[in-house]
Amino acid sequence: VDYDTYADGEALFGWLNGTYAIKKEESFETLATAFLANLGERFDSLNLNVGHVKFLLQGKEEGLVGNIVGKKETATLRKLDNASEKVFLTVNARVEVHPDKLVEIVKEEVERVFNVVGYKEETLNALIPGRPNPTFRYREIVKL
């Protein structure tokens, strides 16, 4: 791996991780579909490259996982049959935009979609990743 090239590429992407407590568990599939579509539309309208956007909307009986790995057409939503004591939303995103703008977009879309059921932001972190510094590294290409 050329770590200089890798670091240059990674530095273009804002990273975001957020968790939200959801107050009422209702219309989860509708909410997840809207959240996924809205994020895809926003990123496409700003012509932003999406590395990935993932979210889990977890209810007491089932969860919904949304993914975008490029343009909005790549968006997928699937159900999980796992139960939870808590009702929450977890968002993980890597998008070619400054982290502050990524936070702004995600916060606006969370508010737009989840305000009808109520939510509370628990954690929200965004950053530009630092240069990788692997513990073990080959000095030359290893041929297998």
For the regions a protein language model found, what residue spans apply to each?
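P-loop NTP-binding site
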Residues: 2-144
